[in-house]
């Protein structure tokens, strides 16, 4: 593998406590080019931070899903439920499931943020008050 010095970044992985105790700055170079040290990096659509907290990734994902939920709320006035589901499966569900096995170990607080958006999508598409939100989620699959 050949490294491209201008595109290469470095990241020091440690817990939050270790970063606070000794903020370490790496001074690395490759072929006389300084390698930039970063605290987070997007790779294949996943944002990895130097603490492996998944907070930046899930925050970004929630922002994207929220925008799409707004579009879904506007769309529901013009199309039937089957078209809403199509929009959900094309524009919301992939963000909830992409690489979920990687960031599955996130904190309960971050998981709750994603879950609340998922539940909001179910409520938007199925306003039937006789169904519980869990039943609506099961209906979505």
PLM features per residue range, with description:
Residues 1-12, 18, 110-141:
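Short, charged alpha-helical motifs in flexible N/C-terminal segments and linkers
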Residues 25-30, 58-63, 137-140:
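Short intrinsically disordered coil segments
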Residues 52, 97-100, 104-107, 122, ...:
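Hydrophobic/aromatic-lined pockets within catalytic cores
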Residues 32-102:
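Basic, alpha-helical interaction scaffolds
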Residues 1-5, 75-82, 102-104, 129-132:
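Surface-exposed helix-capping loop/turn segments at secondary-structure junctions
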Residues 82-90, 108-119:
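An alpha-helix initiation/capping motif
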Residues 2-39:
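Short, conserved micro-motifs composed of acidic
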């Amino acid at each position: 593998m050949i490294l491209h010095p201008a595109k290469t970044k470095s990241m020091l992985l440690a817990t939050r406590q270790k970063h606070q105790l000794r903020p370490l700055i790496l001074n690395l170079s490759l072929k006389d080019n300084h390698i930039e040290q970063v605290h987070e990096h997007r790779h294949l659509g996943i944002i990895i931070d130097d603490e492996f907290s998944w907070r930046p990734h899930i925050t970004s994902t929630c922002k994207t899903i929220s925008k799409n939920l707004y579009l879904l709320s506007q769309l529901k006035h013009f199309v039937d439920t089957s078209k809403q589901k199509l929009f959900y499966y094309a524009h919301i569900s992939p963000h909830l499931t992409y690489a979920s096995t990687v960031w599955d170990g996130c904190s309960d607080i971050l998981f709750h943020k994603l879950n609340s958006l998922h539940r909001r999508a179910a409520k938007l598409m199925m306003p039937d008050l006789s169904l519980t939100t869990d039943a609506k989620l099961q209906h979505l699959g």
